[in-house]
């Protein structure tokens, strides 16, 4: 299975699609929000600038998220103002670029993200914990697949929005399910109706091992997406075993997610991916 075959509205013209990240600056309601130095107008302006750089550098899609809203609220505790601001930022990005756009709302705010996606026209939602559970920096995170899949049905969005679901996601403790392998968790996502599986390393900037990616690939038919640590140096090796990648830190100056997107870093990465695509033809 390859991601462009998903019957859920995503459309990428190339194999091994690469999704770049647009990290919205602190949104209204979050502790770091400062309307004097970074109001919504400036937040949107910066997001549009970075989305355009990513598109011009050759990425196949972008994902918008509220990464700066630390410390994160969880699930149903995510505030209305966060959802509203994320929806506005997402909608602006969607209308500013011609490539597909997705969304994530921290922490595991898949219902808020789905509401934004349906309202604005995003093609996918990243879900940190579709099934099973883990301990995040925000505390215990429970599975949300049952609730958000029913919400998608109520909104008649089965053919327009898909769920990209992490397994053994970065930045968390998975001791409570340590007797379940990553491969078994990937099989759970497939059995429980997820549309794709995201495989990560331990934290942002750390890649998954080739063995982890390939072992998941061997067990399921869903697309496998790399979710952390992909760089110009390892992109070809890892993407040989995966169907796509979400790249955040590597496209930023000094490999730091808090810094601006850098065109040349992104372009160099995409050249490596384009070489791989040529070799696979």
Region spans (language model):
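Eukaryotic N-terminal low-complexity, Ser/Thr- and Lys/Arg-rich leader segments
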Residues: 1-7, 280-281
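Alpha/beta enzyme core
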Residues: 19, 24-76, 81-101, 108-222, ...
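A short, charged/proline- and glycine-enriched loop
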Residues: 14-17
């Amino acid at each position: 299975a390859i991601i462009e075959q998903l019957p859920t509205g995503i459309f990428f013209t190339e194999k091994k699609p690469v999704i770049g990240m647009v990290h919205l600056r602190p949104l209204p309601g979050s502790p770091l929000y400062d309307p004097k130095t970074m109001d919504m107008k400036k937040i949107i302006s910066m997001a549009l600038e970075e989305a355009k750089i990513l598109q011009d550098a050759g990425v196949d899609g972008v994902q918008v998220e509220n990464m700066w809203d630390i410390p994160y609220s969880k699930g149903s505790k995510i505030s209305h103002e966060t959802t509203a601001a994320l929806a506005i930022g997402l909608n602006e990005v969607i209308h500013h670029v011609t490539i597909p756009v997705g969304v994530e709302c921290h922490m595991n705010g898949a219902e808020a993200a789905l509401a934004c996606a349906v309202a604005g026209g995003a093609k996918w939602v990243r879900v940190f914990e579709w099934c099973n559970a883990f301990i995040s920096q925000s505390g215990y995170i429970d599975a949300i697949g049952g609730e958000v899949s029913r919400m998608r049905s109520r909104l008649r969005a089965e053919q327009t929005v898909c769920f990209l679901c992490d397994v053994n996601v970065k930045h968390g403790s998975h001791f409570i399910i340590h007797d379940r392998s990553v491969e078994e968790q990937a099989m759970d996502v497939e059995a429980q109706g997820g549309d794709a599986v995201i495989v990560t390393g331990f934290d942002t900037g750390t890649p998954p091992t080739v063995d982890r990616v390939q072992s998941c690939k061997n067990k399921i038919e869903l697309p496998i997406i790399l979710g952390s640590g992909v760089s110009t140096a390892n992109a070809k090796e890892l993407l040989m075993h995966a169907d796509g990648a979400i790249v955040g830190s590597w496209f930023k100056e000094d490999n730091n997610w808090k810094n601006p997107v850098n065109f040349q870093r992104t372009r160099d990465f995409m050249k490596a991916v384009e070489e791989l695509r040529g070799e696979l033809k």
